[in-house]
Amino acid sequence: MNPKPEADRKLSVVVAGGGTAGHIEPAMAVAEAVRAQRPDARITALGTTRGLETTLVPARGFDLQLIPPVPVPRKLNKDLATLPLRLRKALKETKRVLREVEADVVIGFGGYVSAPAYLAARSLKIPFFVHEANARAGVANKLGVKLGGTGLAAVEDSGLEAEIVGIPVRESVLQLDRKALRAEAREFFGVDPEAPLLLVTGGSQGARSINNAVVDAAKTLQDAGIGVLHAYGKKNDIELPAEVQEGKPRYVAVPYIERMDLALAAADAILCRSGAMTVAEVSAVGLPGIYVPLPHGNGEQELNVRPITHAGGGVIIKDAELTGHRVSQEVIPLLRDETRWQAASLATLAAGHRDAAEKIAEKIIAAADA
Protein backbone atom coordinates (compact mmCIF):
# COMPACT_ATOMS: atom_id res chain seq x y z
CA MET A 1 0.00 0.00 0.00
CA ASN A 2 1.25 3.48 -0.83
CA PRO A 3 1.89 5.67 2.22
CA LYS A 4 -0.57 8.43 3.02
CA PRO A 5 -0.25 11.09 0.28
CA GLU A 6 2.19 13.79 1.39
CA ALA A 7 1.39 17.46 0.92
CA ASP A 8 3.85 17.68 -1.97
CA ARG A 9 2.61 14.52 -3.70
CA LYS A 10 -0.55 14.42 -5.76
CA LEU A 11 -3.37 12.06 -4.90
CA SER A 12 -3.35 9.22 -7.46
CA VAL A 13 -6.62 7.47 -8.31
CA VAL A 14 -7.13 4.68 -10.84
CA VAL A 15 -10.60 4.08 -12.30
CA ALA A 16 -11.27 0.77 -14.06
CA GLY A 17 -14.37 0.60 -16.21
CA GLY A 18 -13.85 -0.28 -19.84
CA GLY A 19 -15.92 -1.85 -22.59
CA THR A 20 -19.36 -0.30 -22.84
CA ALA A 21 -20.61 3.18 -22.03
CA GLY A 22 -22.43 1.65 -19.06
CA HIS A 23 -19.06 0.91 -17.46
CA ILE A 24 -17.16 3.95 -18.74
CA GLU A 25 -19.58 6.80 -18.02
CA PRO A 26 -19.83 6.13 -14.25
CA ALA A 27 -16.03 5.89 -14.11
CA MET A 28 -15.69 9.24 -15.87
CA ALA A 29 -18.31 10.82 -13.62
CA VAL A 30 -16.35 9.76 -10.53
CA ALA A 31 -13.09 10.92 -12.12
CA GLU A 32 -14.64 14.35 -12.71
CA ALA A 33 -15.92 14.48 -9.12
CA VAL A 34 -12.49 13.59 -7.70
CA ARG A 35 -10.92 16.28 -9.85
CA ALA A 36 -13.51 18.81 -8.63
CA GLN A 37 -12.60 18.04 -5.00
CA ARG A 38 -8.87 17.60 -5.59
CA PRO A 39 -7.96 19.62 -8.71
CA ASP A 40 -4.34 18.45 -8.62
CA ALA A 41 -5.20 14.74 -8.37
CA ARG A 42 -3.62 12.35 -10.83
CA ILE A 43 -6.41 10.28 -12.36
CA THR A 44 -5.69 7.29 -14.56
CA ALA A 45 -8.24 5.17 -16.40
CA LEU A 46 -7.63 1.50 -17.16
CA GLY A 47 -9.02 0.15 -20.39
CA THR A 48 -8.50 -2.17 -23.35
CA THR A 49 -8.32 -1.68 -27.10
CA ARG A 50 -11.71 -3.38 -27.46
CA GLY A 51 -13.87 -0.82 -25.73
CA LEU A 52 -15.34 2.64 -26.23
CA GLU A 53 -12.87 3.98 -23.67
CA THR A 54 -10.28 4.51 -26.42
CA THR A 55 -12.35 7.50 -27.57
CA LEU A 56 -14.48 8.42 -24.54
CA VAL A 57 -11.68 8.69 -21.96
CA PRO A 58 -9.27 10.95 -23.90
CA ALA A 59 -12.23 13.11 -24.94
CA ARG A 60 -12.89 13.79 -21.26
CA GLY A 61 -9.28 14.79 -20.65
CA PHE A 62 -8.06 11.77 -18.67
CA ASP A 63 -5.02 9.54 -19.10
CA LEU A 64 -5.84 6.07 -20.45
CA GLN A 65 -3.61 3.06 -19.84
CA LEU A 66 -4.39 -0.08 -21.84
CA ILE A 67 -4.16 -3.64 -20.52
CA PRO A 68 -5.07 -6.98 -22.15
CA PRO A 69 -8.83 -7.70 -21.93
CA VAL A 70 -9.96 -10.54 -19.68
CA PRO A 71 -13.58 -11.42 -20.46
CA VAL A 72 -14.81 -13.96 -17.92
CA PRO A 73 -16.82 -16.74 -19.67
CA ARG A 74 -20.25 -17.25 -18.13
CA LYS A 75 -20.41 -20.82 -19.46
CA LEU A 76 -18.01 -23.72 -19.82
CA ASN A 77 -16.29 -23.33 -23.19
CA LYS A 78 -12.84 -23.26 -24.79
CA ASP A 79 -12.24 -19.68 -23.59
CA LEU A 80 -12.19 -20.96 -20.02
CA ALA A 81 -9.00 -22.96 -20.71
CA THR A 82 -7.07 -19.83 -21.71
CA LEU A 83 -8.42 -17.70 -18.86
CA PRO A 84 -5.51 -18.27 -16.40
CA LEU A 85 -2.87 -17.25 -18.96
CA ARG A 86 -4.80 -14.18 -20.09
CA LEU A 87 -5.44 -13.19 -16.50
CA ARG A 88 -1.75 -13.49 -15.59
CA LYS A 89 -0.76 -11.24 -18.49
CA ALA A 90 -3.40 -8.66 -17.61
CA LEU A 91 -2.51 -8.78 -13.92
CA LYS A 92 1.18 -8.22 -14.63
CA GLU A 93 0.40 -5.22 -16.82
CA THR A 94 -2.09 -3.80 -14.32
CA LYS A 95 0.42 -4.02 -11.47
CA ARG A 96 2.92 -2.17 -13.65
CA VAL A 97 0.43 0.65 -14.21
CA LEU A 98 -0.52 0.91 -10.53
CA ARG A 99 3.12 1.09 -9.50
CA GLU A 100 3.97 3.58 -12.24
CA VAL A 101 1.22 6.02 -11.26
CA GLU A 102 1.77 5.36 -7.53
CA ALA A 103 -1.92 4.59 -7.08
CA ASP A 104 -3.41 5.47 -3.70
CA VAL A 105 -6.88 4.10 -4.45
CA VAL A 106 -8.49 1.98 -7.17
CA ILE A 107 -12.17 1.87 -8.08
CA GLY A 108 -13.71 -0.57 -10.56
CA PHE A 109 -17.05 -0.44 -12.34
CA GLY A 110 -17.25 -3.92 -13.83
CA GLY A 111 -16.28 -4.94 -17.34
CA TYR A 112 -13.15 -6.53 -18.80
CA VAL A 113 -10.60 -4.46 -16.89
CA SER A 114 -12.08 -4.66 -13.41
CA ALA A 115 -11.02 -8.18 -12.39
CA PRO A 116 -7.29 -7.52 -13.04
CA ALA A 117 -7.64 -4.16 -11.28
CA TYR A 118 -9.13 -5.74 -8.15
CA LEU A 119 -6.54 -8.52 -8.08
CA ALA A 120 -3.65 -6.10 -8.62
CA ALA A 121 -4.90 -3.68 -5.96
CA ARG A 122 -5.23 -6.47 -3.42
CA SER A 123 -1.79 -7.84 -4.28
CA LEU A 124 -0.21 -4.40 -3.86
CA LYS A 125 -2.25 -3.66 -0.71
CA ILE A 126 -3.95 -0.64 -2.29
CA PRO A 127 -7.47 0.10 -0.99
CA PHE A 128 -10.10 -0.48 -3.66
CA PHE A 129 -13.79 0.06 -4.27
CA VAL A 130 -16.26 -1.94 -6.35
CA HIS A 131 -19.21 -0.09 -7.93
CA GLU A 132 -22.15 -2.03 -9.36
CA ALA A 133 -24.52 -0.04 -11.55
CA ASN A 134 -26.87 -2.88 -12.47
CA ALA A 135 -29.61 -4.46 -10.41
CA ARG A 136 -27.74 -7.77 -10.59
CA ALA A 137 -24.01 -7.79 -10.01
CA GLY A 138 -21.62 -9.12 -12.63
CA VAL A 139 -18.94 -11.77 -12.11
CA ALA A 140 -16.01 -9.32 -11.89
CA ASN A 141 -17.67 -7.18 -9.24
CA LYS A 142 -18.69 -10.18 -7.15
CA LEU A 143 -15.03 -11.23 -7.25
CA GLY A 144 -13.93 -7.73 -6.24
CA VAL A 145 -16.02 -7.70 -3.07
CA LYS A 146 -14.89 -11.23 -2.17
CA LEU A 147 -11.30 -10.02 -2.51
CA GLY A 148 -11.95 -7.35 0.09
CA GLY A 149 -13.08 -4.40 -1.99
CA THR A 150 -15.58 -1.95 -0.52
CA GLY A 151 -18.91 -2.52 -2.27
CA LEU A 152 -20.99 0.36 -3.64
CA ALA A 153 -24.25 -0.29 -5.49
CA ALA A 154 -26.97 1.52 -7.39
CA VAL A 155 -29.90 -0.38 -5.89
CA GLU A 156 -30.74 -2.86 -3.14
CA ASP A 157 -30.40 -6.62 -3.63
CA SER A 158 -27.74 -6.49 -6.34
CA GLY A 159 -26.03 -9.57 -4.97
CA LEU A 160 -23.19 -7.57 -3.41
CA GLU A 161 -22.62 -6.59 0.18
CA ALA A 162 -22.64 -2.90 -0.59
CA GLU A 163 -23.67 0.58 0.44
CA ILE A 164 -26.39 2.06 -1.78
CA VAL A 165 -25.05 5.21 -3.43
CA GLY A 166 -26.77 5.27 -6.83
CA ILE A 167 -25.09 5.64 -10.21
CA PRO A 168 -22.55 8.43 -10.78
CA VAL A 169 -23.77 10.76 -13.53
CA ARG A 170 -21.55 13.14 -15.50
CA GLU A 171 -21.50 16.76 -14.42
CA SER A 172 -22.80 18.04 -17.77
CA VAL A 173 -26.05 16.13 -17.18
CA LEU A 174 -26.34 17.18 -13.52
CA GLN A 175 -25.89 20.83 -14.49
CA LEU A 176 -28.39 20.67 -17.36
CA ASP A 177 -30.93 23.48 -17.00
CA ARG A 178 -33.75 22.06 -19.10
CA LYS A 179 -36.00 25.06 -18.67
CA ALA A 180 -33.33 27.56 -19.74
CA LEU A 181 -32.29 25.44 -22.74
CA ARG A 182 -35.77 24.42 -23.89
CA ALA A 183 -36.23 27.05 -26.61
CA GLU A 184 -32.69 26.63 -27.99
CA ALA A 185 -32.98 22.84 -27.91
CA ARG A 186 -36.28 22.79 -29.73
CA GLU A 187 -34.99 25.14 -32.40
CA PHE A 188 -31.88 22.94 -32.79
CA PHE A 189 -33.98 19.86 -33.59
CA GLY A 190 -36.67 21.70 -35.53
CA VAL A 191 -39.54 20.54 -33.32
CA ASP A 192 -42.60 22.54 -32.29
CA PRO A 193 -41.58 25.27 -29.81
CA GLU A 194 -44.59 24.78 -27.53
CA ALA A 195 -46.23 21.36 -28.01
CA PRO A 196 -45.55 18.54 -25.53
CA LEU A 197 -42.62 16.51 -26.89
CA LEU A 198 -41.87 12.80 -26.58
CA LEU A 199 -38.22 11.79 -26.99
CA VAL A 200 -37.82 8.25 -28.35
CA THR A 201 -34.57 6.30 -28.40
CA GLY A 202 -33.56 2.66 -28.44
CA GLY A 203 -29.88 3.41 -27.87
CA SER A 204 -27.17 4.03 -30.46
CA GLN A 205 -28.27 1.03 -32.55
CA GLY A 206 -31.98 1.67 -32.12
CA ALA A 207 -34.63 -0.88 -31.23
CA ARG A 208 -36.94 -2.26 -33.89
CA SER A 209 -39.84 -2.99 -31.54
CA ILE A 210 -39.76 0.58 -30.19
CA ASN A 211 -39.48 2.02 -33.71
CA ASN A 212 -42.46 0.03 -34.99
CA ALA A 213 -44.70 0.85 -32.03
CA VAL A 214 -43.99 4.58 -32.08
CA VAL A 215 -44.50 4.84 -35.84
CA ASP A 216 -47.82 3.04 -35.39
CA ALA A 217 -48.76 5.59 -32.73
CA ALA A 218 -47.53 8.59 -34.72
CA LYS A 219 -50.88 9.78 -36.11
CA THR A 220 -52.70 9.33 -32.79
CA LEU A 221 -50.00 11.26 -30.94
CA GLN A 222 -50.04 14.03 -33.54
CA ASP A 223 -53.83 14.30 -33.36
CA ALA A 224 -53.47 14.68 -29.58
CA GLY A 225 -51.11 17.63 -30.10
CA ILE A 226 -47.92 15.78 -29.15
CA GLY A 227 -44.66 16.13 -31.07
CA VAL A 228 -42.03 13.40 -31.36
CA LEU A 229 -38.23 13.45 -31.59
CA HIS A 230 -37.32 9.91 -32.63
CA ALA A 231 -33.75 8.53 -32.80
CA TYR A 232 -34.35 5.27 -34.66
CA GLY A 233 -30.76 3.95 -34.86
CA LYS A 234 -27.98 4.11 -37.42
CA LYS A 235 -28.65 0.60 -38.73
CA ASN A 236 -32.42 1.01 -38.98
CA ASP A 237 -34.91 2.91 -41.07
CA ILE A 238 -38.51 3.92 -40.53
CA GLU A 239 -41.32 4.94 -42.86
CA LEU A 240 -43.71 7.60 -41.60
CA PRO A 241 -47.14 8.06 -43.17
CA ALA A 242 -47.24 11.09 -45.46
CA GLU A 243 -49.95 12.71 -43.35
CA VAL A 244 -47.67 12.53 -40.30
CA GLN A 245 -44.70 13.95 -42.21
CA GLU A 246 -46.81 16.90 -43.32
CA GLY A 247 -48.76 17.31 -40.08
CA LYS A 248 -48.21 19.27 -36.89
CA PRO A 249 -46.80 19.11 -34.25
CA ARG A 250 -43.78 17.82 -36.14
CA TYR A 251 -42.54 14.25 -35.92
CA VAL A 252 -38.77 14.59 -36.33
CA ALA A 253 -36.95 11.32 -37.06
CA VAL A 254 -33.14 11.06 -37.05
CA PRO A 255 -30.76 8.06 -37.09
CA TYR A 256 -28.80 9.21 -34.04
CA ILE A 257 -28.72 12.12 -31.60
CA GLU A 258 -25.26 13.53 -30.94
CA ARG A 259 -26.50 16.29 -28.61
CA MET A 260 -28.39 14.19 -26.08
CA ASP A 261 -28.14 17.07 -23.61
CA LEU A 262 -30.26 19.21 -25.92
CA ALA A 263 -32.64 16.31 -26.58
CA LEU A 264 -33.22 15.92 -22.83
CA ALA A 265 -33.79 19.68 -22.55
CA ALA A 266 -36.27 19.71 -25.44
CA ALA A 267 -38.32 16.73 -24.26
CA ASP A 268 -41.18 16.46 -21.78
CA ALA A 269 -41.03 12.65 -21.55
CA ILE A 270 -38.91 9.82 -22.90
CA LEU A 271 -39.64 6.36 -24.28
CA CYS A 272 -36.53 4.20 -24.08
CA ARG A 273 -34.80 1.03 -22.89
CA SER A 274 -33.83 0.84 -19.22
CA GLY A 275 -30.10 0.28 -19.09
CA ALA A 276 -28.64 1.42 -15.78
CA MET A 277 -26.92 4.51 -17.18
CA THR A 278 -29.96 5.58 -19.18
CA VAL A 279 -32.18 5.35 -16.10
CA ALA A 280 -29.64 7.30 -14.02
CA GLU A 281 -29.33 10.17 -16.51
CA VAL A 282 -33.07 10.39 -17.19
CA SER A 283 -33.88 10.49 -13.47
CA ALA A 284 -31.10 13.03 -12.82
CA VAL A 285 -32.85 15.57 -15.06
CA GLY A 286 -36.37 14.73 -13.84
CA LEU A 287 -37.75 13.44 -17.13
CA PRO A 288 -40.76 11.11 -16.80
CA GLY A 289 -40.19 7.87 -18.68
CA ILE A 290 -41.98 5.09 -20.48
CA TYR A 291 -39.46 2.27 -20.19
CA VAL A 292 -39.27 -0.81 -22.41
CA PRO A 293 -36.72 -3.16 -20.81
CA LEU A 294 -34.55 -5.23 -23.13
CA PRO A 295 -36.24 -8.65 -23.23
CA HIS A 296 -32.96 -10.58 -23.09
CA GLY A 297 -30.44 -11.36 -20.35
CA ASN A 298 -31.37 -11.91 -16.73
CA GLY A 299 -34.13 -9.32 -16.48
CA GLU A 300 -31.83 -6.69 -14.98
CA GLN A 301 -33.16 -3.86 -17.17
CA GLU A 302 -36.60 -4.16 -15.60
CA LEU A 303 -35.04 -4.26 -12.13
CA ASN A 304 -32.93 -1.17 -12.94
CA VAL A 305 -35.99 1.00 -13.35
CA ARG A 306 -38.18 -0.40 -10.55
CA PRO A 307 -37.20 2.33 -8.04
CA ILE A 308 -38.34 4.98 -10.54
CA THR A 309 -41.64 3.32 -11.42
CA HIS A 310 -42.41 2.50 -7.78
CA ALA A 311 -41.94 6.18 -6.96
CA GLY A 312 -44.35 7.19 -9.73
CA GLY A 313 -41.76 8.60 -12.12
CA GLY A 314 -42.53 6.31 -15.03
CA VAL A 315 -44.11 3.12 -16.31
CA ILE A 316 -42.80 -0.14 -17.71
CA ILE A 317 -44.08 -1.72 -20.92
CA LYS A 318 -42.79 -5.22 -21.62
CA ASP A 319 -41.28 -5.54 -25.09
CA ALA A 320 -43.78 -8.25 -26.06
CA GLU A 321 -46.66 -5.94 -25.09
CA LEU A 322 -45.35 -2.87 -26.92
CA THR A 323 -47.84 -1.66 -29.53
CA GLY A 324 -48.81 1.67 -31.00
CA HIS A 325 -52.04 1.59 -29.01
CA ARG A 326 -50.16 0.99 -25.74
CA VAL A 327 -47.75 3.84 -26.50
CA SER A 328 -50.64 6.24 -27.08
CA GLN A 329 -52.38 4.92 -23.97
CA GLU A 330 -49.40 5.81 -21.77
CA VAL A 331 -48.06 8.94 -23.46
CA ILE A 332 -51.18 10.99 -24.12
CA PRO A 333 -52.57 11.10 -20.54
CA LEU A 334 -49.08 11.89 -19.21
CA LEU A 335 -48.31 14.75 -21.59
CA ARG A 336 -51.80 16.27 -21.76
CA ASP A 337 -52.26 16.49 -17.98
CA GLU A 338 -49.94 19.10 -16.45
CA THR A 339 -50.63 17.98 -12.87
CA ARG A 340 -49.85 14.35 -13.66
CA TRP A 341 -46.73 15.29 -15.61
CA GLN A 342 -45.42 17.53 -12.81
CA ALA A 343 -45.94 14.78 -10.22
CA ALA A 344 -44.09 12.25 -12.39
CA SER A 345 -41.21 14.66 -12.95
CA LEU A 346 -40.79 15.34 -9.23
CA ALA A 347 -41.02 11.61 -8.43
CA THR A 348 -38.32 10.84 -10.98
CA LEU A 349 -35.97 13.41 -9.46
CA ALA A 350 -36.64 12.19 -5.93
CA ALA A 351 -35.93 8.56 -6.82
CA GLY A 352 -32.54 9.32 -8.35
CA HIS A 353 -29.16 9.83 -6.68
CA ARG A 354 -27.84 13.10 -8.09
CA ASP A 355 -25.01 13.21 -5.55
CA ALA A 356 -23.65 9.70 -6.27
CA ALA A 357 -20.42 10.84 -7.96
CA GLU A 358 -19.71 13.40 -5.24
CA LYS A 359 -20.27 10.85 -2.45
CA ILE A 360 -18.05 8.24 -4.10
CA ALA A 361 -15.30 10.80 -4.65
CA GLU A 362 -15.43 11.68 -0.95
CA LYS A 363 -15.04 7.99 -0.03
CA ILE A 364 -12.08 7.60 -2.39
CA ILE A 365 -10.29 10.63 -0.98
CA ALA A 366 -10.99 9.54 2.60
CA ALA A 367 -9.54 6.08 1.88
CA ALA A 368 -6.39 7.65 0.42
CA ASP A 369 -6.00 10.00 3.37
CA ALA A 370 -6.61 7.30 6.00
UniProtKB/Swiss-Prot annotation:
PANTHER family in alphabetical order: GLYCOSYLTRANSFERASE, UDP-N-ACETYLGLUCOSAMINE--N-ACETYLMURAMYL-(PENTAPEPTIDE) PYROPHOSPHORYL-UNDECAPRENOL N-ACETYLGLUCOSAMINE TRANSFERASE 1
Function: Cell wall formation. Catalyzes the transfer of a GlcNAc subunit on undecaprenyl-pyrophosphoryl-MurNAc-pentapeptide (lipid intermediate I) to form undecaprenyl-pyrophosphoryl-MurNAc-(pentapeptide)GlcNAc (lipid intermediate II).
GO molecular function: UDP-N-acetyl-D-glucosamine:N-acetylmuramoyl-L-alanyl-D-glutamyl-meso-2,6-diaminopimelyl-D-alanyl-D-alanine-diphosphoundecaprenol 4-beta-N-acetylglucosaminlytransferase activity; undecaprenyldiphospho-muramoylpentapeptide beta-N-acetylglucosaminyltransferase activity
Pathway: Cell wall biogenesis; peptidoglycan biosynthesis
Listed Pfam families: Glyco_tran_28_C, Glyco_transf_28
Membrane topology listed for this record: Peripheral membrane protein
EC numbers for this chain: 2.4.1.227
Residues annotated for UDP-N-acetyl-alpha-D-glucosamine binding in this entry: T20, A21, G22, N134, R170, S204, I257, Q301
HAMAP family the UniProt entry points to: MurG
The entry's keywords: Cell cycle, Cell division, Cell membrane, Cell shape, Cell wall biogenesis/degradation, Glycosyltransferase, Membrane, Peptidoglycan synthesis, Transferase
Cellular location(s): Cell membrane
Species this protein is from: Corynebacterium jeikeium (strain K411)
Recorded family membership: Belongs to the glycosyltransferase 28 family. MurG subfamily.
Primary localization: membrane
Protein name, entry field: UDP-N-acetylglucosamine--N-acetylmuramyl-(pentapeptide) pyrophosphoryl-undecaprenol N-acetylglucosamine transferase
Source organism superkingdom: Bacteria
